[in-house]
């Protein structure tokens, strides 16, 4: 029988399995212990908990491991931890830990801290990804290729320019992630179930003890809101959505029908019946899991939106979707990094396609217009010549000498990639 509901009576194995979060709580086990340590320290600091009891509890908490606490007989890890302490120290000592706390504010704190830990791991992976993108961009700064719009060959660029586009996505994601991390660093501790606690807790001090930087002001919002989870999951899924577009490009370009990307052997599999096949399975799984992450974000939003402002067990069910998004993203970026490091790009084939499919037509038309011919007149004349097969287009080298900032000009690519690599060397990962 669960601990807290023992005065109500046995709920039965079916209901216990159905409502318990104990299996999912492995994600927050370390943070739950950390939050409890901060709580006990603070109660002792303000003279509410006897020092002897606090010392005994803190010493015992050092021995606590997730494996000891994740027992299926409990509703959740918070109940399991309190019962574990009481079993070891007795109610006269460990019975103090329930004062001034609710599972509502403590689980919100543990989720925030665990989310911070996972967000930090993801951030480090994305920072590493940016450094590899910059290194590859410098390597392929002069590697001409067609860009693609509407899945049709478009303006001539370089593969280095393409990689810097992915880098800019990563940079924008890290900017958003930093803002979300500030939300995560606000403590809900001391908020109680909804309206605070009569125990004279210094919420700012308790926040610092638990590893937070600030306090969520309103107690109801602190314990009952999951905006921080929605914001984090939304940012991560938006990043995965955009990155999956690059993954889709790489999968297509790996096809021998295109022949731009040579995938490392470790990332491909083969067919059970067609021995010639080299299927880029890692990126296929990435693409699928990016879509799955979007499903988890939708589920997270759907669960949260249907309950009033205050804790309900629905929020317990919502949290697993946050972990799924973060875990998929972290693992997916690791796969993407490994692929980037080991792949190669066929510059000869890509250049041939850029020339074959008129990828310098816009630059040719612009150059004619800049000599004094109205652009639309130059455009239609060039279109006619392309149709007739008589067009004399600019060379790839000439076309790429665009003077605008952020263009595919190889010198622009080299400058941007080199600047990025300096930062990578100054802050090695």
UniProtKB/Swiss-Prot annotation:
GO biological process: arginine biosynthetic process via ornithine; L-arginine biosynthetic process
InterPro entries, A to Z: Argininosuccinate_lyase (IPR009049), Fumarase/histidase_N (IPR024083), Fumarate_lyase_fam (IPR000362), Fumarate_lyase_N (IPR022761), L-Aspartase-like (IPR008948)
Compartment(s) where it occurs, according to its Swiss-Prot or TrEMBL record: Cytoplasm
EC class of the enzyme, as a word: lyase
GO CC annotation, single: cytosol
GO molecular function, one term: argininosuccinate lyase activity
Enzyme Commission (EC) number: 4.3.2.1
Pathway assigned to this chain's UniProt record: Amino-acid biosynthesis; L-arginine biosynthesis; L-arginine from L-ornithine and carbamoyl phosphate: step 3/3
Main location group: cytoplasm
Catalyzed reactions: 2-(N(omega)-L-arginino)succinate = fumarate + L-arginine
Record keywords: Amino-acid biosynthesis, Arginine biosynthesis, Cytoplasm, Lyase
Keyword Lyase tagged: yes
Family label: Belongs to the lyase 1 family. Argininosuccinate lyase subfamily.
Descriptive protein name: Argininosuccinate lyase
Protein species of origin: Pyrobaculum islandicum (strain DSM 4184 / JCM 9189 / GEO3)
